[in-house]
Amino acid sequence: MTKYNWDERHIITFPEKELALEIKDLHVYYGQKEAIKGIDMQFEKNKITALIGPSGCGKSTFLRSLNRMNDTIDIAKVTGQILYQGVDVNASNINVYEMRKHIGMVFQRPNPFAKSIYRNITFAHERKGVRDKQTLDEIVETSLKQAGLW
């Protein structure tokens, strides 16, 4: 058995955490209703973080805030900071489409938009300015083939 000298002082230092995201004083409003109230949180890089809570407590609202999915909700307002590599993703000069290449979402249950399969597949491309029908048709066909649905 190892014997310790309890009179000897041992200083243990831990390395700084490398953060994937840092949340500072995050508030989310739907009109006058405050859905998220001042969250401060850090997500460590290469670690799994679980958000647990009862239905309606704001988990989905919080997650949607991380990559600005709440931007599509007219009455939603987000304040505070969501820092990715030191940059606030809520800044007005952020290219949302480029940012979402780095901060993606994979939900437990697929939740397509209330549109056709074709429109769900072409949605992001159309938002980026792709308008050519032949190009969009090719994107849909390729996507469905890759998913084994063509």
Roles of regions detected by a PLM:
Residues 21, 36-38:
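Conserved structural motif at the start of ABC-family nucleotide-binding domains
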Residues 49-50, 105:
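Short beta-strand immediately N-terminal to the Walker A/P-loop
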Residues 81-88, 133-150:
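Conserved ABC ATPase "signature" region
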Residues 73-74, 110-119:
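Conserved catalytic motifs of ABC-family nucleotide-binding domains
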Residues 75-77, 88-104, 127, 133:
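ABC ATPase NBD coupling module
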Residues 1-27:
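ABC-family P-loop ATPase nucleotide-binding domain
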Residues 52-55:
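The feature captures the beta-strand-to-loop junction immediately N-terminal to the Walker
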